[in-house]
């Protein structure tokens, strides 16, 4: 449930997505904060309808990892919203995790709780970017590329 101004805008986006796509959402966060946000934004009735229709499920968690906190905080705060969400995927109770919160914490939690595919050292983070053609968004990946200098001794060919 992390993210700027969360949970209000996140809840609004989830409810809009449910209205537009054939998906069900497990909304992980402090339930009282989610319900308060729904009330403040006038979304209480819509939220309750989607819960009643089994399109949205509220799942209680501990405090989120803040945007300015170290990614490794996920190891200490076991019941954080990102850890609870990753556990849902690990236990085959969800297919994906979407977070508007701390990207480093999200990646750390995914690695610690779900693991990596064999041979993958640095998983990518993907984001859909809109285009002028609204039916064709573009998937942009942050693959964590680093620039490094390689120092090697000269080969025998170079000294001849």
What are these regions (language model features)?
Residues 151-160:
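Single conserved hydrophobic/aromatic residue that forms the stacking wall/gate
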Residues 6, 149-150:
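Secondary-structure boundary/capping motif
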Residues 109-142:
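Short, acidic/small-residue loops that bind anionic groups at enzyme active sites
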């Amino acid at each position: 449930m992390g993210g700027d101004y969360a949970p209000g805008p996140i809840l609004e986006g989830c409810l809009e997505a449910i209205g537009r796509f054939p998906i069900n959402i497990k909304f992980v966060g402090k339930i009282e904060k989610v319900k308060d946000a729904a009330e403040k934004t006038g979304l209480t009735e819509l939220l309750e309808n989607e819960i009643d229709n089994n399109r949205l499920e509220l799942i209680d968690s501990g405090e989120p990892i803040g945007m300015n906190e170290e990614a490794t905080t996920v190891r200490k705060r076991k019941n954080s919203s990102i850890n609870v969400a990753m556990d849902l995927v690990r236990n085959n109770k969800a297919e994906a995790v979407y977070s508007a919160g701390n990207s480093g914490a999200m990646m750390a939690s995914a690695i610690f709780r779900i693991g990596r595919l064999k041979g993958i050292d640095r998983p990518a983070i993907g984001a859909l970017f809109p285009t002028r053609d609204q039916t064709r968004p573009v998937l942009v990946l942050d693959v964590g590329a680093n620039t490094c200098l390689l120092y090697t001794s000269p080969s025998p060919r170079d000294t001849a």
